[in-house]
Amino acid sequence: MVLTLLFSAYKLCRFFIMSGPRPGADRLTVPGPDRSGGTSPWWAAGGRGSREVSPGVGTEVQGALERSLPELQQALSELKQASAAQAVGAGLAEVFQLVEEAWLLPAVGREVAQGLCDAIRLDGGLDLLLRLLQAPELETRVQAARLLEQILVAENRDRVARIGLGVILNLSKEREPVELARSVAGILEHMFKHSEETCQRLVAAGGLDAVLYWCRRTDPALLRHCALALANCALHGGQTVQRCMVEKRAAEWLFPLAFSKEDELLRLHACLAVAVLATNKEVEREVEHSGTLALVEPLVASLDPGRFARCLVDASDTSQGRGPDDLQSLVLLLDSSRLEAQCIGAFYLCAEAAIKSLQGKTKVFSDIGAIQSLKRLVSYSTNGTTSTLAKRALRLLGEEVPRRILPCVASWKEAEVQTWLQQIGFSQYCENFRDQQVDGDLLLRLTDEELQTDLGMKSSITRKRFFRELTELKTFASYATCDRSNLADWLGSLDPRFRQYTYGLVSCGLDRSLLHRVSEQQLLEDCGIRLGVHRTRILSAAREMLHSPLPCTGGKPSGDTPDVFISYRRNSGSQLASLLKVHLQLHGFSVFIDVEKLEAGKFEDKLIQSVMAARNFVLVLSAGALDKCMQDHECKDWVHKEIVTALSCSKNIVPIIDGFEWPEPQALPEDMQAVLTFNGIKWSHEYQEATIEKIIRFLQGRPSQDSSAGSDTSLEGATSMGLP
């Protein structure tokens, strides 16, 4: 106990020493190379004479580096000379502590840690770590991987990509122990950010397979790394890698991560990953089919980005927030046509705005173009969650928050047009538009010639800028008052940009049933679609639509009947329920699981209908799963209702047992006691595939209710639940 307190006091003192002012630090220059023969620190070299640095931050970074670099060099020297495993472990621990303390420094932690990480590489420490990752001692590999994960800044990722990917991939084949898996998943998380080529190499050589395998584990830190690794892979890997991720069922494996009830950070990172995948039109349908995408918007709406930002700051590996390149990737989500991508992108940028405002580094948002994208969401987004997050981010960044644009543009009066002109930066033309009495209808049908001749916009570049804004307005506008056949959404399904043509088409009296009869010349001259490629694509899709009837609302799609309904207790069974969903989907079963997205008034009806429609009823018996059913004689508990419905409909009931203790039959209401007569299968986290195979046998027509014979216990996985 005393040693623990002394060690904690030592760490606290050293933290304040590193972050405190340097004695005599009154000069604002970084010394250049010492021409008298001495050597200056490597991070100060490279200029002629002294180089000026910005006041405040530059001095703090310089001072922190001057204090910590000698300790780092000493620790690296001892590590290089160490031969015994114990000495190597002590050296790795010392270097790790120095780097971790640097990352935790407020405001300047990223710059100081960057300096230490560069020093480790330049002093040969990075190459040494790659060798230690191949050591025979497991503990050495674990510690080396833990340190490597901490120092993978951009330049170090370059080095690992050149000489160390094979080492990392060999480590990823060691699926155990969890301590090693955590760090290897963290290393892959960073390396997926390196480049599209590196992502492709990692995916092709098994790195993605390792991450997907670890998604079935229960360790929170490991699962967070997996979620972020998949998000980075999707963000930086390009469309080819995204297609490969979908083929390997990454969207399905993200479901249990996004469905977790214990870890909000994990859920958010998983939602980010699946939202990025959904932005790829080639795989969008497969991602939707996974069911994971439906979790994104409800989760984001329920969370506070300020609290999320505090969680990031409190963690050593995320305390500095994201760098400019990562932020740039998030900005791309704001420009997506998918609501889920806009929503999660706005949430992350709002949290990052909170972090950067504390650090005094908000300028990065202007540099990467985030301000305009956030303002556009505020102006045009019809989703309240997305718009609110964008407003909050702009306020944190000290930016003006624009007014929301009314979506029914065709119904605008002249005053709304004037407001829009001011908002997009064309105030100087307000008088001309007012003199010509331009309303929403005229605005949507405005031509280049009219803009130049009648409205006095002489500069062709200015007109291009104006039409860029007008195209965006047309794309986000609502045409519900004039678009009876929902032509806008059909055009948007072909390409989000095609929504801009809606008003021109409906103004000519066209709808979806007539579009295939129109010629390309009519689309050009009457409807104003100037781009020939767009005309060809629209006509081609319209003619194909003849063979695909319009969706009707009267019937129920045949695919709406699930093979399996999963019933579970939220507080103890959600993780297993989500894992079962993924495993069963991968084996071809359609699965219904309540994702808490149902409207309040329809909750009971929808659940009961789903139980009745499903062919099989899987009951997750986790710890205390039936406790709320006891004494529930009015059948108000949801699990109770689901069980009673399954029994009354004679469903094939398959109980899955995980840490469940049997109640006395008399303790349960009479209408559900029969559930205890069904044979159950004991869930094994270590042997998931074998357990799933047994579950599938129960689902494929072998009844689980058998009061005489009991169930097959050869797997050590089935448990008889018969009444005494």
Swiss-Prot record:
GO molecular function: NAD+ nucleosidase activity; NAD+ nucleosidase activity, cyclic ADP-ribose generating; signaling adaptor activity
Binding site for NAD(+) 1: 103, 110, 149-157, 190-193
Transit peptide: 1-27
UniProt domain TIR: residue ranges: 560-703
Subunit structure: Homooctamer; forms an octameric ring via SAM domains. Interacts with TICAM1/TRIF and thereby interferes with TICAM1/TRIF function. Interacts with MAPK10/JNK3 and SDC2 (via cytoplasmic domain).
SUPFAM superfamilies: ARM repeat (SSF48371), SAM/Pointed domain (SSF47769), Toll/Interleukin receptor TIR domain (SSF52200)
Protein function: NAD(+) hydrolase, which plays a key role in axonal degeneration following injury by regulating NAD(+) metabolism. Acts as a negative regulator of MYD88- and TRIF-dependent toll-like receptor signaling pathway by promoting Wallerian degeneration, an injury-induced form of programmed subcellular death which involves degeneration of an axon distal to the injury site.
Positions bearing Phosphoserine: S548, S558
Entry keyword set: Cell projection, Cytoplasm, Differentiation, Hydrolase, Immunity, Innate immunity, Mitochondrion, NAD, Neurogenesis, Phosphoprotein, Repeat, Synapse, Transit peptide
InterPro entries according to UniProt: ARM-like (IPR011989), ARM-type_fold (IPR016024), SAM (IPR001660), SAM/pointed_sf (IPR013761), SARM1 (IPR039184), TIR_dom (IPR000157), Toll_tir_struct_dom_sf (IPR035897)
Name used for this protein in its record: NAD(+) hydrolase SARM1
Origin species: Rattus norvegicus
Bias kind Polar residues: ranges: 703-717
Catalytic site positions: E642
Domain writeup: The TIR domain mediates NAD(+) hydrolase (NADase) activity. Self-association of TIR domains is required for NADase activity. The ARM repeats inhibit the NAD(+) hydrolase (NADase) activity by binding to NAD(+): NAD(+)-binding to ARM repeats facilitates inhibition of the TIR domain NADase through their domain interface. In contrast to classical ARM repeats, the last helix of ARM 6 does not fold back to interact with the first two helices, but instead turns towards the N-terminus of SARM1. As a result, the two following motifs ARM 7 and ARM 8 reverse their directions and lie perpendicularly. Moreover, ARM repeats interact with different domains not only within each protomer but also of the adjacent ones.
First-tier enzyme category under EC: hydrolase
EC number(s) reported in the record: 3.2.2.6, 3.2.2.-
Taxonomic superkingdom: Eukaryota
ARM repeats mapped onto the chain: 60-100, 114-153, 155-193, 196-235, 237-280, 281-314, 315-354, 359-402
Segments for region (Disordered): 703-724
